[in-house]
UniProtKB/Swiss-Prot annotation:
GO terms for cellular component: adherens junction; apical junction complex; cell-cell contact zone; dendrite; growth cone membrane; hippocampal mossy fiber to CA3 synapse; membrane; plasma membrane. Cell adhesion molecule that promotes cell-cell contacts and plays important roles in the development of the nervous system. Acts by forming homophilic or heterophilic trans-dimers. Heterophilic interactions have been detected between NECTIN1 and NECTIN3 and between NECTIN1 and NECTIN4. Involved in axon guidance by promoting contacts between the commissural axons and the floor plate cells. Involved in synaptogegesis. Has some neurite outgrowth-promoting activity. (Microbial infection) Acts as a receptor for pseudorabies virus/PRV. This is Nectin-1. Residues 1-30 form the signal peptide. One of its GO terms (biological process) is regulation of synapse assembly. Belongs to the nectin family. Cis- and trans-homodimer. Can form trans-heterodimers with NECTIN3 and with NECTIN4. Interaction between NECTIN1 and NECTIN3 on the pre- and postsynaptic sites, respectively, initiates the formation of puncta adherentia junctions between axons and dendrites. Interacts (via cytoplasmic domain) with AFDN (via PDZ domain); this interaction recruits NECTIN1 to cadherin-based adherens junctions and provides a connection with the actin cytoskeleton. Interacts with integrin alphaV/beta3. Interacts (via Ig-like C2-type domain 2) with FGFR1, FGFR2 and FGFR3. (Microbial infection) Interacts with herpes pseudorabies virus/PRV envelope glycoprotein D. The chain crosses the membrane at residues 355-375. The lineage of its organism: Eukaryota, Metazoa, Chordata, Craniata, Vertebrata. Keywords: Cell adhesion, Cell junction, Cell membrane, Cell projection, Disulfide bond, Glycoprotein, Host cell receptor for virus entry, Host-virus interaction, Immunoglobulin domain, Membrane, Phosphoprotein, Receptor, Repeat, Signal, Synapse, Transmembrane, Transmembrane helix. The modification Phosphotyrosine is found at Y435.
Length: 515
């Protein structure tokens, strides 16, 4: 009804707009009959058909308002309003049609108790003088809400081994709808649906959907819902399937820890069946039950302490009206009880161990890397820079105090190297030396020695901190009876040849040198 009212309001505004357009546009002084283009209503409800007349010419006189229905190319009068004769409603509408506000400009009527036969084209006509009749048409659609329901099959659904044929399990019906409904199914079942439409003589449509599937134990107690969508309405109704099937048998009670002298143990036969199992039968794979074992319906009791004789395969057969099925369990007997460690306990114990192991491994890896770096730096610092040539060992510059043993001079911060060395450079002190040098005065003194600064004669030699063995021997012959820092001694030479100079100023034996 709210939607019909909204459509009617839209029609009135549309008609008013047309009337104003006809009135204000130059040259358009035609009379306009305003109606809704289309209307709809449901069977049994009321519908209002709007009609009004826009008369831009005051000189035009309205004499009558008439409602007609088009039927098979002809017009059938329904209701008439005449200012002189009043309102007249013709059969079969005399009890169903009324003018709401009868006047020269408003011919709106109400049609009550809609029937399917009311659907069609309606005409609103205004008789005017002297311009003649003016009319407009509207289309009325009558809708029928369907009746919906779902029903399960009356046949008994039975699941049988090897069955492949689908059977009807439910039917969903949406009857006497106009227009027809949309029917669907909502379920987890793996079936299929088929649809059928039946057009009734009165113009309505009945939609029927049938759902089929292969009966199975899994389909038992599953929900099957029928969904009907019609216009703005949604219908949903469901049912629960009842499928009969043979027993599905399992045996409970054996926990894998049956040991000698254990007591109070039993086996229970569980049968999933529809209808429920009514009979249980216990046996063993060898035939009869062992001594001390007693069957009571679906329970098997073990009397007394457990012995090795109770080991074996136990079978339970369950029977219902559909059939008989069996299940079995193998019982093993151990000498001593077994207490398994809970899974969560093992996991909890493993977690700290894994964490500690990871941390320890990381620390060890860091220590190894740091140690490797330190060792590499030490080796690089003490790497041997000399050579094993016996011709170029370091002995000093050949100058020292007479009678004072030669000492290795300290290293200077700034270093220079001999120009005549073609091998790797050997470091030596820069500048002059602090050694005492002697000089003979020319022309007097008879060999008198003076102690003072270095003689110019020795400046060049003093700048050379090192000499080779050959150079040292030559210089010894040249200086005669001068006192040299180097005294040729085969034992000392042998000792010197076995010594190696290091960058930090120390000497080590070749026999002890290593990298």
């Amino acid at each position: 009804m709210a939607r019909m009212g909204l459509a009617g309001a839209a029609g009135r505004w549309w008609g008013l707009a047309l009337g104003l357009t006809a009135f204000f546009l130059p040259g358009t002084h035609t009379q306009v009959v305003q109606v809704n283009d289309s209307m709809y209503g449901f069977i049994g409800t009321d519908v209002v058909l709007h009609c009004s007349f826009a008369n831009p010419l005051p000189s035009v006189k309205i004499t009558q308002v008439t409602w007609q229905k088009a039927s098979n190319g002809s017009k059938q009068n329904m209701a008439i309003y005449n200012p002189t004769m009043g309102v007249s409603v013709l059969p079969p509408y005399e009890k169903r049609v009324e003018f709401l506000r009868p006047s020269f400009i408003d011919g709106t009527i109400r049609l009550s108790g809609l029937e399917l036969e009311d659907e069609g084209m309606y005409i609103c006509e205004f008789a005017t003088f002297p311009t003649g009749n003016r009319e407009s048409q509207l289309n009325l659609t009558v809708m029928a809400k369907p009746t919906n329901w779902i029903e399960g099959t009356r046949a008994v659904l039975r699941a049988r081994k090897g069955q492949d044929d689908k059977v009807l399990v439910a039917t969903c019906t949406s009857a006497n709808g106009k227009p027809p409904s949309a029917v669907s199914w909502e379920t987890r079942l793996k079936g299929e649906a088929e649809y059928q439409e039946i057009r009734n003589p009165n113009g309505t449509v009945t939609v029927i959907s049938r759902y089929r599937l292969v009966p199975s134990r899994e389909a038992h107690r599953q929900s099957l819902a029928c969904i009907v969508n019609y216009h703005l309405d949604r219908f949903r109704e469901s049912l629960t399937l009842n499928v009969q099937y043979e027993p599905e048998v399992t045996i409970e009670g054996f926990d894998g820890n049956w040991y000698l002298q254990r007591t109070d143990v039993k086996l229970t036969c569980k049968a999933d069946a529809n209808p429920p199992a009514t009979e249980y039968h216990w046996t063993t794979l060898n035939g009869s039950l062992p001594k001390g074992v007693e069957a009571q319906n679906r329970t098997l009791f073990f009397r007394g302490p457990i012995t090795y004789s109770l080991a074996g395969t136990y079978i339970c057969e369950a029977t219902n009206p559909i059939g008989t099925r069996s299940g079995q369990v193998e019982v093993n007997i151990t000498e001593f009880p077994y207490t398994p460690t809970p899974e969560h306990g093992r996991r909890a114990g493993q977690m700290p161990t894994a964490i500690i192991g990871g941390v320890a491994g990381s620390v060890l890896l860091v220590l190894i890397v740091v140690g490797g770096i330190i060792v590499a730096l030490r080796r690089r610092r003490h790497t041997f820079k000399g050579d094993y040539s016996t011709k170029k060992h370091v002995y000093g510059n050949g100058y020292s105090k007479a009678g004072i043993p030669q000492h290795h001079p300290p290293m200077a911060q700034n270093l220079q190297y001999p120009d005549d060395s073609d091998d790797e450079k050997k470091a030596g002190p820069l500048g002059g030396s602090s050694y005492e040098e002697e000089e003979e005065e020319e022309g007097g003194g008879g060999g008198e020695r003076k102690v003072g600064g270095p003689h110019p004669k020795y400046d060049e030699d003093a700048k050379r901190p090192y000499f080779t063995v050959d150079e040292a021997e030559a210089r010894q012959d040249g200086y005669g009876d001068r006192t040299l820092g180097y005294q040729y001694d085969p034992e000392q030479l042998d000792l010197a040849e076995n010594m190696v100079s290091q960058n930090d100023g120390s000497f080590i034996s070749k026999k002890e040198w290593y990298v």
